[in-house]
């Protein structure tokens, strides 16, 4: 079994087998995976992370497939993290993005990884940020994160992506209302896919009107028409994303806190905060599960009304805190 240092070196060298094994270990929360990530983190931050989200049926995977083509023709290596709904029985991803994008399977410059949401309240599984970091450390130029279409939970994509792309299509009926419900506020680029359909002009007008209602200081959001199945508009989409990235690079930097390597952008700081918060919550969830397993009598006492759940929760927190203090 390779050490954490050896695994990190293999990942940085682009070893597919070692990287895939690490991704699996991260998804399964296996011991030792975090030690490897600690060694990889200083070598991340180079890839362009692009988030693709939107309503079910909008053609997100087709857009991703077309973007892979675009970036590969430009000589870029592309990693894809496709977050799927979980099977309630196996916990596995059931949409099968590898099947949808199987024509890229023999391309060494493309790596596609499906992740299951495992009931996570946001559209992203708990290990998504780590998998993105692995692909980054492997040397991929672009990492595309495609999320499930679950409404407002799509805001999770912002914590992972430099540019968030929201995809909609004409004819869904309530697609604009769904965007009003919260997705619009996270969009850096809006895509009207299947724009050869009737109603595309109206969808673009409605989106334009909604953007006009935003605060004047809000960042500009471009609207791009695509027909992803034919590759139409994909060049324009990629260029719109690049313009957003360039605007972010020119954004004012925030003064560094004590101990930081240097100034950074507010957006990058927010992404770092979201990542740290997710790992703290993940650590606490595991601690709760482990403590509950060891203190099964607490649940029994609550179930029989011998103890109220509020006091049980307080006792659980005290047990976790004592355990952490003893480490």
Q: Predicted segments — roles?
A:
Residues 3-50, 58, 64-175:
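Nucleotide-state-sensitive switch-loop elements of NTP-binding domains
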Residues 4, 19-20, 33, 204, ...:
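A general structural signal for well-ordered alpha-helical segments in protein cores
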Residues 54:
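The Walker A (P-loop) glycine that initiates the GxxxxGKT/S ATP-binding motif of P-loop NTPases
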Residues 81, 167, 192-193, 226:
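Generic beta-sheet signal
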Residues 94, 131, 156, 160, ...:
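Alpha-helical scaffold elements adjacent to nucleotide-binding pockets in ATP/GTP-utilizing enzyme cores
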Residues 157, 170-198:
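Flexible active-site lid/hinge loop adjacent to a nucleotide/diphosphate
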Residues 189, 195-247:
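Canonical P-loop GTPase G-domain recognition
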Residues 225-228, 236-324:
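Long, well-ordered amphipathic alpha-helical subdomains in the mid-to-C-terminal portions
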């Amino acid at each position: 079994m390779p050490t954490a240092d050896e695994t990190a070196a293999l990942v940085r060298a682009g070893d597919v087998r070692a990287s895939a094994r690490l991704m699996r270990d991260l998804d399964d929360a296996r011991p030792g995976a975090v030690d490897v990530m600690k060694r990889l983190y200083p070598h991340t931050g180079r890839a362009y992370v692009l988030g693709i989200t939107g309503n079910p049926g909008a053609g997100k995977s087709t857009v991703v497939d077309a973007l892979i083509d675009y970036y590969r023709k430009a000589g870029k290596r592309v990693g894809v993290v496709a977050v799927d709904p979980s099977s309630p029985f196996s916990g596995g991803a059931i949409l099968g993005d590898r099947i949808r994008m199987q024509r890229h399977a023999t391309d060494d410059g493309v790596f596609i990884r499906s992740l299951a949401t495992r009931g996570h309240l946001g559209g992203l599984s708990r290990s998504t940020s780590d998998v993105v970091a692995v692909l980054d450390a492997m040397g991929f130029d672009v990492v595309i994160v495609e999320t499930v279409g679950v409404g407002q939970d799509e805001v999770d994509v912002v914590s992972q992506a430099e540019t968030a792309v929201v995809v909609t299509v004409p004819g869904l009926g309530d697609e604009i209302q769904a965007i009003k419900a919260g997705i619009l506020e996270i969009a850096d680029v809006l895509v009207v896919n299947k724009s050869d359909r009737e109603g595309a002009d109206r969808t673009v007008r409605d989106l334009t009107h909604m953007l006009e209602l935003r605060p004047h200081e809000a960042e500009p959001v471009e609207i791009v028409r695509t027909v992803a199945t034919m590759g139409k508009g994909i060049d324009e989409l990629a260029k719109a994303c690049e313009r957003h990235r360039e605007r972010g690079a020119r954004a004012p930097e925030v003064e560094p806190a004590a101990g930081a390597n240097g100034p950074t952008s507010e957006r990058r700081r927010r992404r770092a905060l979201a990542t740290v918060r997710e790992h703290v919550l993940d650590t606490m969830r595991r601690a709760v599960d482990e403590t509950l397993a060891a203190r099964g009598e607490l649940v029994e006492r609550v179930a029989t009304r011998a103890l109220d759940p509020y006091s049980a929760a307080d006792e659980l927190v005290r047990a976790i805190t004592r355990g952490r203090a003893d480490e």
